[in-house]
Curated annotation (Swiss-Prot):
Entry keyword NADP: no
Span list, region Disordered: 142-161, 308-329
Protein name stated in the entry: Pre-mRNA-splicing factor CEF1
Keyword terms of this UniProt record: Coiled coil, Cytoplasm, DNA-binding, mRNA processing, mRNA splicing, Nucleus, Repeat, Spliceosome
GO MF annotation list: DNA binding
Species annotation: Candida albicans (strain SC5314 / ATCC MYA-2876)
Gene Ontology CC annotation, any one: spliceosomal complex
Amino acid sequence: MAPPLYVKGGVWTNVEDEILKAAIQKYGIYQWERISSLLPKKSAKQVKARWVEYLSPLLNKTDWTKEEDEKLLNLHKIFPNQWRSISNILNRTAVQCVERYQKLIDEAAGIKPGDDEENLGLSGPGIETLPAVGASSGLAVGEMNLNPESKPARPDDEDLPDDEREMLAEAKARLGNIQGKKAKRKARERMLEESKRIALLQKRRELKSAGINVKLTTRNKKKRKEFDYNADIPHEIIPQAGPYDTAEELKQNDFEKQQFGQQVSTKGISMKDIDDRIAKEESRRKKEIEKKKLERKREFNAAASLISEHEDSKRRKLNLPEPGTHNFEKTKSDVLTLTNQANNKLSEKEIARNQNKKRAAVAQLIKATFERLPPPKHETGEILPFVSTNILEFRNDVNANDISDIAGAKLPDETATNVSTLISRVVQRELPIPHPNNLRDLSTVKFDTLVDKLIAEECHRLIRSDYKQYHDTTINGVSTDKYDRDLLEKINQDIDKEFAQMDVSTVHSFEDYVLPKNFKVAESIIENLHTFHNENEKLTNKILESTNYEDQRDQKLQQLTHLWRELSDVNLSYSIEKKLFELESSAIDKELLRLRSEIDKLNKKIETLR
């Protein structure tokens, strides 16, 4: 006898709806076969129809408006019985469109819900969208519900049947499983190793109680000397201990390792963190690759634009005469080509002239920047003896290679030492030169004598000259000429003579300006330091107090803003209540007037009837 054929379907329950929602959260809205495997009484098509027709949050379950009713009637005239197309246009399900259309037709025909003519209504395009007859629509005994997917779920019983309990337990187990195959295998291996270790310890304990001592390690020396790749690290190089104490770090590492082992043994390895880290690394790698591609593309485009500009500047237009032209036209075309060539030559000359100007400006700029470089402080090399410029005198005694070396070398000259003494002492001592714009205007300064004024003007002129020569050549100023050495020596001699004739008693010695060095001065300095320290502490305390004041001010401001908001809310509510009271009072007055007028009319009618 063949087994009974079980047809899937039937009324949906709350348990099945919840399982369907949880499965869609995990698997999505495309894996209907996998979702239907959690519901043994439903097929994949029924599961999809239940989601699309009833459970989807995208469904429009609001009341129908007049505009939608008019649109539904017009669309049914255009697309008769094409409920799928009509539902897509109205953003509703086909069952909703069918039921609404049937309701509108019944209302227009005057048919009530309890009439027999209701059974002649329309049906949808398929079994999933037929007007369903659920538990709430008054199914007769023995009738079959053809489309329960679009109707509310049946309430659960107080005691669930065994098959629904099994279905719920299996769904919980499958949907709550977040570990992969590898994590499960690792957990099984870990549990197996733990059980083996516990069994070995139990066996050793029993043997020890019987008087037999058994070690966990083997006694075979050959096997004991073999390397255990599971327990140790092959070719491990332990780093040497450094100057710092790492005992606390090692304790922390051991604690974290033990904590991680306990977490893995209880909960297992979470693959989510590893997957997230791998995804972040892949996204970062992709971003770097895209960034490199963009940089290469930009460089390639820049190089291509430069090459194209260079080629365009070289390229000339090819002007050929049309075929079959006369001699006169040929001469015209020849003249035009000659003029074009001349114009091209002129344009090339202009381009070359502009390039030469740019090169000259760049060369001047480079020269100015090189002139700003300070002279070398540490020169190494041997000082060659002075040799006359006439090489013919000693050519016989020197080889050709020596002559080339001597000609390429820079021989010392007395003029270099003489010139170095003719520049200003500030430059000789490599002291900083002030900027000319920072100097005071001499017109605003009052001088006692004319000599002081001349000295100040000469000082200004010398500063501008040195700054222009050694820092910035574009600054306004006149460079001073080199001084005559004889004149400089004469001035120095005059200064020495005048200094020798001066009275020694009037000259202050340098000893008067030496700072005192004794114990009292040290004590006074220490006292001053203590006073400065105390003042600094007072200032810091004041700063801290000011910060406390600022915090209190911020708190007060927050309280004020909060109170102001509350006051504004209360004021708004008061104004609203006041407006409502005014409107209600006006409405009451109008209603009283209306009622009084009606009472007067009734009184008049009563009087007339009497």
